[in-house]
Amino acid sequence: MVFPVEAIVGLVTFTFLFYFLWTKKSQKPSKPLPPKIPGGWPVIGHLFYFDDDGDDRPLARKLGDLADKYGPVFTFRLGLPLVLVVSSYEAIKDCFSTNDAIFSNRPAFLYGEYLGYNNAMLFLANYGSYWRKNRKLIIQEVLSASRLEKFKHVRFARIQTSIKNLYTRIDGNSSTINLTDWLEELNFGLIVKMIAGKNYESGKGDEQVERFKKAFKDFMILSMEFVLWDAFPIPLFKWVDFQGHVKAMKRTFKDIDSVFQNWLEEHIKKREKIMEVGTEGNEQDFIDVVLSKMSNEYLGEGYSRDTVIKATVFSLVLDAADTVALHINWGMALLINNQNALKKAQEEIDTKVGKDRWVEESDIKDLVYLQAIVKEVLRLYPPGPLLVPHENVEDCVVSGYHIPKGTRLFANVMKLQRDPKLWSNPDKFNPERFIARDIDFHGQHYEYIPFGSGRRSCPGMTYALQVEHLTMAHLIQGFNYRTPTDEPLDMKEGAGITIRKVNPVKVIITPRLAPELY
């Protein structure tokens, strides 16, 4: 059933008029509040401000334009919650250095409850004991440098298999390859192999994984949908489910959870057999690792062991299968449109590695220009252009402004990393800027935080960088590229919270190496 905007506005206004009057604070803060963008309505605020405005760019772009108009620190309301948007070096540093602990909470979103194992997924969990233990498990056991080193043969083998598959698609000099689809298949198959030990290839075999892949796409859509409860968190909008989102989330979660549960049960049975013969310690994938390190009940935090394992697995799939593929896709599009940079990267690999073998992970440290390319792509197209929203647990001060407790924080990383005060020719693809500039990914250089900063920075950064460097190195080393029309690729960005390329990367490729290497 579709409800008109007027009916929703009327219902919300009636429901919350008394609530607003009753909860309104009378005490004025000692410091000024940040600028608030105009156009908000009573009670609902700016809920429909960004809808049907004729602007189909990503939200980060729209908020960047507002920063140009109202400054790098401003607010608006999405229903009841106040949203703070920051995009300057100074404000970002205030949030993730001075106020890092204060901004370490997550806002409550309905999808976290119904799709995110009741917020057991690490990136959705509030800051506290559970979050600390789960993050420690992931960083020290699952995604540690030593653990990832043990699995490097899996990454190399999967990328090699996918490269050979790409080679078989070449039909003369005129066949067009959809590189975007290929990257999605590669990254999805790679993370499924590393997490569950499954060999997945699209359209071949595992019906269960195919069902999960569809449910995963539904998750991505549902997690970005506007849900009334997120703006007005009262039980009414959960119980009545005006928009049908709760029903859709429950259905999608059932499909996702059934796959994870089957994987988990398979691993538990396998582990029991291993323990019977006394060969414990030979972990083959991430589920093996988590099972070996986690107690039966998750340390009294209210989640069962199985729930935490499935939530952890889901977090890893979400990060690896989606954001990594998205970033490599932008990177290859930039290189194809900048053939001089592509040729320079090819020459570096030819010189340092040669053309009689493929690039390996141990070579990456010597490929300085490749590293600069990855950094530059992350600068222009950060995987989370607004990061995951934060929420402050107490009043604080950002850039001299009073920020009330419970404010949601959007850090506009895309705007920050294209700030002309910090970057020369900020919209130009120029990997050379990172040759002369000593800057890393760890979030301590507040002009460059593609993986976030502070306590809530991305724990999967090391894995993502390993896959991105190795995949791009293979694609650069193995093939030449041109577009079917010999015109530059369209770089149009899609609407929404993430930055997705509207049109896939479709190119004609020709091999650069000897046939036996494919």
UniProtKB/Swiss-Prot annotation:
The chain crosses the membrane at residues 2-22. GO terms for cellular component: membrane. Disulfide bonds: none annotated. InterPro entries: Cyt_P450, Cyt_P450_CS, Cyt_P450_E_grp-I, Cyt_P450_sf, Plant_Cytochrome_P450_Monoox. Keywords: Alkaloid metabolism, Heme, Iron, Isopeptide bond, Membrane, Metal-binding, Monooxygenase, Oxidoreductase, Transmembrane, Transmembrane helix, Ubl conjugation. It catalyses: (S)-nicotine + reduced [NADPH--hemoprotein reductase] + O2 = (S)-nornicotine + formaldehyde + oxidized [NADPH--hemoprotein reductase] + H2O + H(+). There is a cross-link at residue 254 (Glycyl lysine isopeptide (Lys-Gly) (interchain with G-Cter in ubiquitin)). It is found in: Membrane. One of its GO terms (biological process) is alkaloid metabolic process. Its EC number is 1.14.14.-. One of its GO terms (molecular function) is iron ion binding. Heme binds at residue 458. It comes from the Eukaryota. It is a single-pass membrane protein. Its cofactor is heme. Pfam families: p450 (PF00067). Its main location: membrane. Pathway: Alkaloid biosynthesis; nicotine biosynthesis. Belongs to the cytochrome P450 family. CYP82E2 subfamily. Involved in the biosynthesis of pyridine alkaloid natural products, leading mainly to the production of anabasine, anatabine, nicotine and nornicotine, effective deterrents against herbivores with antiparasitic and pesticide properties (neurotoxins); nornicotine serves as the precursor in the synthesis of the carcinogen compound N'-nitrosonornicotine (NNN). Catalyzes the demethylation of nicotine to form nornicotine. This is Nicotine N-demethylase CYP82E3. It comes from Nicotiana tomentosiformis (Tobacco).
